């Protein structure tokens, strides 16, 4: 089921609006300083502009906390519309929770200044979606007639169906409750939105459209599991754009078919080619995507939706990543896709299953820092992978693929570069120059407990070398209170920024 946005309800959907400062200017830029600092080594002419910070209110619209995925679409003359997902949830997570559930903001930016000219809620928190993570926008470059925003729930929580939910109901196996893990789409022009259950019930990090020149729409989606190491890569194929909205596509899971040494038995969990640790820097594997039964993809079996898909993937020897994050296609050759895996401490082989496991405390892991994978799709068939290799590895000192990054999370490409944002900890933004092959640090998040996220190529709107990104502070909140149950409710600090790095 899809729903069209009711703009008349927006005032009622703005949480805490009467308690927050209201900014009534036509064009607005946050008075807060940028939440990132450019590296001294960036080219001359580099700059960062802070656009809007969490908690700031414009004509009744409040920019919520935990901004994450970003998608861009043409706005009215002289502007670009920016859609931003918010990774919020009222379900307690490590002792804290947000004041509201996930939402999507729509913010118009003036192309000449980057200032905000208008803002509204594109998908309201009352729908009860949880933890919208990264996101992407598909448009004419990806074969879409309408600009379509893709995001998804990064959670496996089992919850009551929200009172305001209009696009989904309970799951049969756990009724009257439902489990998180929906992929969600939104039409940038009409405001219509809908979950796409057949895209897999999993911890969706991001979904992107891959314009490989095939006669089908091909969407890749990544599993940012909370139970690492047990993530998978999925492909959703649809005959046309409308079939995505009506969920008439099919879901497929990645499996290796061949290593450098020759073909492997795809069904054998001891084939030495079914997980992250089996693929080492310098290796070049091949693979295929195998079909996921529709009832399992949609989560309508007798098991909880995510449990059913995970069990099916293990039974069918689907390639096991550790914790998949963002992904982006190469704008020079769209059949090439870069995929981030943030890694995890204490990950080692499991001799009993032929897969991976996390060892006990003190175990020396083999994938602490994560990787970037490079996947090349077949020219004629999106279900065939001609090359699957390690592109950058944070745990392989001495190898040509070694990059001293820690836990890559969000990524995007331009015609010249790959940008990689680290998770919390180091929280650096890495710039990889396709022309020279070099890696360098472009910027770092100021708050050591925060992270940057959602980076997207904005060169079509703000000129070459332009990127829009956001920051999740984690270490500070705009507003917080402890509820009767002892849970810290918060509106976490965050910020949207425009970064320009000449040549990137």
Q: Which role fits each region the language model picked out?
A:
Residues 11-22:
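Bacterial N-terminal signal peptides
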Residues 3, 22-23:
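Short hydrophobic transmembrane-like helices used for membrane targeting/insertion
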Residues 26-504:
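Sequence/structural signature of beta-propeller domains
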Residues 2-11:
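Bacterial N-terminal signal peptides that target proteins for export
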